[in-house]
A protein has these predicted regions:
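Hydrophobic anchor at the start of a short beta-strand
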Residues: 26-28, 113, 189
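Glycine-rich FAD pyrophosphate-binding loop
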Residues: 22-44
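Short beta-strand to alpha-helix junction loop
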Residues: 56, 90-99, 130-149, 283
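Central helical "cap/lid" subdomain
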Residues: 38, 182-235, 245-250, 262, ...
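Helical element adjacent to the flavin cofactor pocket in flavoenzyme catalytic cores
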Residues: 131-188, 192-202
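Dinucleotide-binding Rossmann-like beta1-alpha1 core, especially the glycine-rich loop
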Residues: 46-129
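N-terminal Rossmann-like FAD-binding beta1-loop-alpha1 element of flavoenzymes
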Residues: 3-29
């Protein structure tokens, strides 16, 4: 079969590209290795819609984050959880950024940073500053349903699940992709596989990116009433974040120190658990 675009990966970026190209009348094929969309990075993360607060040593990154924050909110506001206080704090110990520096950074980036008493959230002396900020979380399942509804209305867009590319080759001016029992061609191939990018590079004979892979655990939990409408992120070092997880009613708990369990610097991620689980680590 011949298409205008072949997209590898049915996460947020893959389905976004499919919806945009399909709405423009192009014939699109999406190949997803998993049995459903949004099963990896789009869902397995903090669900934080970044405003730029994480980047006090890069104004350009912070400003770009703030710009795309507003764009994401405008386009996908229906999947956001916005009704909570997002608090950033700077630790008084082992932090690369203190309260005064964080204030200056936010002012220069043009993002909200309103002082609140650190003792409202932390034991005395632990943090030298705490700030009310503007940041939201998104619900991946709500966003997934929206994309699938939009794509279902586009007969020129096809999604094949449980189809991992086995072979990619040039066929004249087109790319020929074989995935299981399917072979398709298109003049344009989009790799939207995120952490799977080097798998695709290997099929193409391209050099791999130097990627650090981490096997991470994100804890989803219920919190007491005092924290239900609060998110807390402690900067700027080996600290933690506790924040609402989309519209689920749960909070995610992550730690710079304890969330990553293992690290791989191989071109394609390799972890000991893969040998016991058919190549894919599971909880």
């Amino acid at each position: 079969m011949t298409y205008d675009k072949i997209i590898l990966g049915a996460g947020l970026y893959g389905l976004y590209a499919a919806q945009k190209c399909g709405a423009a009348g192009q014939r699109v094929l999406v190949l997803e290795r998993d049995p459903a969309p949004f099963m990896r990075a789009t869902y397995i993360n903090q669900a934080r819609v970044h405003m730029g607060y994480h980047y006090p040593r890069s104004y350009s990154t912070a400003i770009k984050s703030a710009h795309y924050f507003e764009r994401f909110c405008a386009d996908y506001g229906f999947c956001l959880h916005t009704e909570f206080d997002q608090v950033y704090a700077t630790s008084a110990h082992f932090s690369w950024t203190n309260a005064a520096e964080f204030r200056r950074f936010c002012a220069a980036a043009g993002i909200r940073c309103d002082d609140v008493a650190p003792e409202r959230y932390f034991n005395p002396g632990l943090c030298d500053g705490a700030f009310l900020t503007k940041e939201y979380t998104y619900d991946a399942q709500v966003l997934k349903r929206w994309f699938l509804e939009k794509l279902a209305a586009l007969p020129n867009v096809e999604i094949l699940y449980s189809h991992k590319p086995d072979k990619i080759e040039k066929a004249g001016s087109a790319w020929r992709v074989t995935a299981g029992d399917t072979t398709a061609e298109a003049p344009y191939l989009l790799n939207a596989t995120y952490a799977g990018v080097n798998d695709v590079h290997a099929l193409l004979g391209l050099p791999p990116f130097g990627i650090k892979y981490e096997k991470c655990e994100i804890i989803l939990c219920t919190v007491e009433d005092a924290l239900k409408h609060t998110g807390i992120t402690v900067m700027d070092g080996p600290f933690f974040s506790l924040m609402p997880f989309g519209q689920t009613g749960l909070h995610s708990l992550t730690s710079v120190t304890f969330t990553p369990h293992e690290t791989s610097y191989d071109s394609v991620a390799t972890f000991p658990c893969q040998a016991e689980s058919g190549g894919c680590c599971t909880p």
